[in-house]
């Protein structure tokens, strides 16, 4: 990928999240007519250009009968490629031409994109808790012996999610006699797959866990984009050392919200407190909110982190403040990939499962 195009995509990625499709697109704004494919190229888009300066494009060839002698070129758009016609000039612009044209306009914004992984080099990871203190916290957050042996142990040993092939006869969460964390109540409505299938490890050019902090502004108003820095991490999951460096790096732009409650409070009033505190801090210019249950003790009980993140995230969206801040979860509850995914799904930017 040419360096100038790389800069263009870095800029675009800082204004909005990528749209995966699958989609083959034909569109016009009365100045341009374009055809394009999604970044994975999962839907076909074929084109033919004739000597009469006509462009034919669609999902199939042969939609219109053409004289083969008049055909100048024909082909198929690859993943993320685009082909356009500038109506006023009567000229066809190919993929490289359009991206060269766009790259000239936005390359200077790349000075604001900072890779945090280079600033957080980790040599030795430390355990925050050991012995009885660790066991008490595991009990507090509802860890079972099965969780430790069948979920955590394989993850620690193989650095990947545990897999099993037995049937699941676990009672439904709402009918279970045993404590079940709130994460267990969240399920996919259906098995979401790509067609054709994509391997996130072997096809990492189109699959990424990269996480960004900050936003350049309104994608529809390029003339008034902010000059704030955009920070990028390779993964939304932060180890304890990484989180320590993260807090130190953002310094005064960090504020911690306590996600515990006491006998004098209840969960509902505590969530209202969190929402009000978050709103005040964002209006004061804080860019990193840390929702933490680390203050848990015999007199302070953890609120389910999913409720905390979801409440603050939704509240800030209603006030149109969400785009000004990142919400970071520091929790002892999160145990497996499902709990990480649900936290991110309800609004967390990063998760530190301390």
Language model regions located:
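Glycine-rich phosphate/ribose-binding loops and adjacent secondary-structure elements
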Residues: 1-24, 30-35, 47, 65, ...
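Conserved short alpha-helical segments that host acidic/polar catalytic motifs at enzyme active sites
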Residues: 1-226
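Non-catalytic terminal/interface segments that mediate subunit docking, oligomerization
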Residues: 158-162, 169-320
């Amino acid at each position: 990928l040419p360096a100038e195009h790389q800069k263009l995509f870095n800029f675009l990625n800082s204004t909005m999240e990528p749209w995966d499709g699958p989609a083959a697109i034909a569109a016009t704004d009365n100045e341009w007519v374009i055809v394009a494919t999604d970044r994975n190229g999962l839907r076909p888009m074929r084109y033919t250009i004739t000597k009469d300066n006509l462009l034919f494009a669609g999902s199939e060839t042969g939609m219109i009968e053409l004289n083969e002698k008049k055909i100048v070129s024909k082909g198929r758009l690859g993943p993320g490629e685009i082909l356009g016609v500038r109506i006023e000039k009567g000229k066809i612009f190919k993929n490289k031409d359009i991206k060269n044209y766009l790259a000239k306009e936005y390359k200077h914004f790349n000075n604001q994109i900072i890779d945090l992984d280079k600033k957080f080099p980790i040599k030795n990871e430390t355990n925050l808790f050991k012995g009885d203190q660790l066991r008490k916290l595991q009990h507090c957050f509802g860890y079972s012996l099965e969780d430790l042996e069948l979920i955590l142990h394989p993850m620690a040993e193989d650095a990947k999610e545990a897999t099993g092939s037995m049937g699941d006869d676990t009672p439904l969460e709402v009918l279970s006699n045993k404590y079940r964390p709130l994460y267990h109540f969240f399920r996919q409505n259906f098995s979401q797959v790509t067609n054709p299938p994509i391997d996130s490890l072997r096809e990492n050019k189109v699959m990424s866990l990269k996480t960004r902090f900050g936003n350049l502004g309104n994608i529809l108003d390029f003339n008034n984009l902010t000059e704030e820095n955009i920070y990028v991490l390779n993964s939304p999951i932060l180890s304890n050392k990484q989180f320590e460096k993260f807090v130190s790096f953002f310094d005064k732009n960090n504020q911690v919200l306590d996600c515990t409650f006491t006998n004098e409070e209840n969960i509902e009033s505590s969530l209202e407190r969190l929402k009000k505190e978050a709103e005040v801090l964002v209006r004061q210019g804080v860019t990193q909110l840390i929702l933490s249950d680390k203050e848990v003790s015999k007199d302070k009980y953890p609120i389910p982190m999913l409720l905390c993140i979801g409440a603050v995230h939704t509240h800030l969206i209603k006030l149109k403040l969400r785009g000004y801040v990142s919400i970071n979860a520091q929790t002892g509850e999160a145990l497996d990939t499902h709990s990480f995914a649900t936290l991110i799904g309800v609004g967390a930017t990063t998760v530190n499962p301390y």
